[in-house]
Amino acid sequence: MNRRESVEFVNMCMIKNGDKVLVQDRVNPDWPGITFPGGHVERGESFVDAVIREVKEETGLTISKPQLCGIKNWYDDKDYRYVVLFYKTEHFTGELQSSDEGKVWWEDFENLSHLKLATDDMSDMLRVFLEENLSEFFYYKDGDDWLYDLK
């Protein structure tokens, strides 16, 4: 039995600054709305180096000590696995600047639920970022419906 599968790795990083968190209002028409910065892991790149690079490209900040705190994953209709690595950190240097990916700013953490978020499941994604007893957000198909479990 062949256990290899096609996988695409991406990352997302929650950067905290006191009671505020860095958000990005993405302009990509395929995935618009407010989320955390992040992006694709390039071939040959370590996961940690990828999240540091993506945050720098999208925000102007250089993060350090990113902690892997969970994953989100699913299979698409072609049986291709998509894995989002969730990181968080409070360690950064540099000056905040927006990029072509979207505008970035510090937002009160408690205000996140009132913003136009990029995904309807962002509140449950936040649970994986924050709750130590959760580490996985897994989407699966049940007939024509997409469901998910938090584990």
Where is each model-derived feature located?
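Conserved hydrophobic/aromatic beta-strand scaffold that supports enzyme active sites
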Residues: 14, 23, 86-88, 106
